[in-house]
């Protein structure tokens, strides 16, 4: 056992301290200024007792907190927690030698997440499937009965989702993950992690899965993209468009966070004639942007582009949209192709957009709106743009994954 003083919260949400011999220690579920007694395992500590609690400590919102690995910071009061999220953005920018105005963090409300990944395991003898999230720093499963982060309609479906998971556990090597999205027409579930080398899911298991899906009144169930049950098309509204989601497609996790980011993008596109929406997905930004400007949209996923194109005709009052399936890593939109583009909106995956950023930097584009789920790769791409003459005007942190260490952001560049 060691008594430790927590000096700060690290990037993964753990408390940072120094042991008696000066070595770094990482202690989860602690807060700055606290003195704790911890059981050490190498550099990691587990709190045994809080000797001096922080005045910023609050009661967690969830009974599973501390064991479930989904949340790391429920025990921290809202104001310092949000300030810490903004500081993580500032730190990553500073590592690339960048400074800018960081606006107040947009905080997504609890009980609003519409997209989750639930893991399924076999229950005990005579029991059904267990469904939940992984334990903190473990492969073990925490069976959940509540989740204050998630939309209550999805939480209410947990028993039906557990019944759906049972047929997918027929093979001992299967470890299913249910990727669940709440849409306007019901739950859309894509299931991965099912052993398929031994002939795949049996006919009996498919039949039982379809029956469970019907009883749960799900919109659609797919197995790694293959539809095994479809009562109705999963639909989402993006701007003025209604989009039919392809299986396994990306959608922002929290509608309020999506709305905030879209509003920022549309505000920056005011007065533009042509906008490029890169890594457009199914059109999260494309359709709202098309209310104010012509839009060129590019995305690697061909099914996403097909869904986007199919929705254009049913969306009234939009300016022209051109969309293509394009790998923006292997075939980024060239600077010459951006010659008549006024604004670029780019929302890459966590790895960033190094190849595409080089082409934007070489172009004559006057404004870039960067949306990112990874401040580290955003900062690296931002450095390239700034070196090419852009100014990073401001950044808005977006706390979409509330109580987790993850932070998203929207940055505005001009030149």
Curated annotation (Swiss-Prot):
Its EC number is 2.1.1.-. Residues 1-52 form the TRAM domain. It holds the Pfam family TRAM. InterPro entries: MeTrfase_TrmA_AS (IPR030390), NA-bd_OB-fold (IPR012340), SAM-dependent_MTases_sf (IPR029063), TRAM_dom (IPR002792), U5_MeTrfase_fam (IPR010280). [4Fe-4S] cluster binds at residues 62, 68, 71, 147. Gene3D superfamilies: 2.40.50.1070, Nucleic acid-binding proteins, Vaccinia Virus protein VP39. The active site is at residue 373. It comes from the Bacteria. GO terms for biological process: rRNA base methylation. It is an enzyme of class 2 (transferase). This is Uncharacterized RNA methyltransferase CC_1326. It comes from Caulobacter vibrioides (strain ATCC 19089 / CIP 103742 / CB 15).
């Amino acid at each position: 056992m060691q008594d430790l003083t927590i000096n700060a919260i690290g990037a993964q949400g753990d408390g940072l301290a120094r042991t008696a011999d000066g070595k770094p220690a990482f202690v989860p579920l602690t807060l700055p200024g606290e003195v704790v007694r911890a059981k050490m395992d190498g550099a990691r500590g587990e709190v045994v007792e809080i000797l001096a609690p922080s005045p910023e400590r609050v009661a967690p919102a969830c009974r599973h907190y501390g064991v479930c690995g989904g949340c790391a910071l429920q025990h921290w009061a809202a104001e310092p927690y949000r300030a810490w999220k903004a500081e993580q953005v500032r730190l990553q920018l500073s590592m690339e030698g960048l400074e800018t105005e960081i606006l107040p963090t947009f905080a997504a409300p609890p009980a609003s997440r519409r997209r989750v990944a639930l893991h399924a395991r076999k229950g005990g003898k005579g029991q059904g499937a267990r469904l939940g999230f992984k334990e903190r720093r473990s492969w073990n499963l925490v069976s959940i009965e509540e989740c204050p982060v998630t939309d209550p309609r999805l939480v209410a479906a947990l028993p039906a989702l557990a019944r759906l998971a049972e047929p997918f556990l027929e093979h001992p090597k299967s470890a299913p993950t249910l990727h669940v999205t709440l849409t306007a027409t019901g739950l859309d579930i894509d299931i991965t992690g099912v052993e398929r080398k031994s002939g795949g899911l049996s006919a009996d298991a498919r039949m039982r899965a379809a029956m469970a899906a019907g009883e749960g009144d799900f919109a659609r169930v797919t197995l790694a993209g293959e539809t095994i049950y479809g009562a109705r098309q999963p639909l989402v509204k993006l701007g003025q468009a209604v989009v039919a989601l392809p299986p396994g497609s990306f959608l922002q996790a929290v509608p309020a966070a999506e709305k905030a980011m879209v509003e920022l993008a549309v505000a920056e596109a005011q007065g533009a004639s042509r906008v490029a929406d890169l890594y457009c997905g199914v059109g999260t930004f494309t359709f709202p942007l098309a209310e104010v400007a012509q839009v060129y949209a590019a995305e690697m996923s061909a099914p996403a582009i097909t869904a986007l194109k199919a929705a254009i005709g049913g969306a009234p009052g939009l300016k022209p949209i051109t969309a293509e399936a394009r790998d923006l890593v292997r075939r980024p939109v060239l600077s010459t192709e951006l010659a008549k583009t006024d604004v670029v909106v780019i929302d890459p995956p966590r790895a960033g957009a190094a190849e595409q950023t080089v082409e934007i930097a070489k172009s004559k584009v006057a404004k870039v709106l960067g949306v990112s789920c990874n401040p580290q790769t955003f900062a690296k791409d931002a450095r390239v743009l700034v070196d090419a003459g852009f100014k990073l005007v401001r950044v808005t942190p977006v706390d979409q994954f509330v109580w987790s260490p993850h932070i998203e952001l929207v940055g505005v560049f001009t030149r």
